[in-house]
UniProtKB/Swiss-Prot annotation:
Keyword hit for Protein biosynthesis: yes
Family: Belongs to the EF-1-beta/EF-1-delta family.
CDD domains given in the database record: EF1B
Protein name as annotated: Elongation factor 1-beta
Disulfide bonds: none
Gene that this sequence comes from: ef1b
Pfam families, sorted: EF1_GNE (PF00736)
TM helices/strands, residue ranges: none
The entry's keywords: Elongation factor, Protein biosynthesis
GO molecular function per UniProt: translation elongation factor activity
Length: 88
């Protein structure tokens, strides 16, 4: 089996959340679980921004769900959606 690139959209709880601090928490929590390829800020509207987290992980059953659960459990995160999964 190979690896997959999964893109997660992470929405903060509040428009006033510090996204750089949230990005640091994401990197800390996912350290050792998967490799973070990139994290980009996405403008949603009305001042709301999301983080698009590109994570590389083994193509194993349940791995993307595990990472999504870890992201959802981070303080300051309101919602996590899986945007894209691609075999690499």
């Amino acid at each position: 089996m190979g690896d997959v690139l999964v893109v997660f959209r992470v929405l903060p709880e509040d428009v006033d959340n510090d996204l750089s601090r949230l990005e640091s928490k994401i990197r800390e929590k996912l350290n050792g679980v998967c490799k973070i390829n990139d994290i980009k800020t996405e403008e949603i509207g009305f001042g709301l921004k999301a983080l698009n987290v590109q994570a590389i992980m083994p193509d194993e059953e349940g791995m993307a769900d595990r990472v999504e659960s870890i992201l959802a459990g981070i303080e300051g995160v309101s919602q996590v959606d899986t945007k894209d999964i691609s075999l690499i």
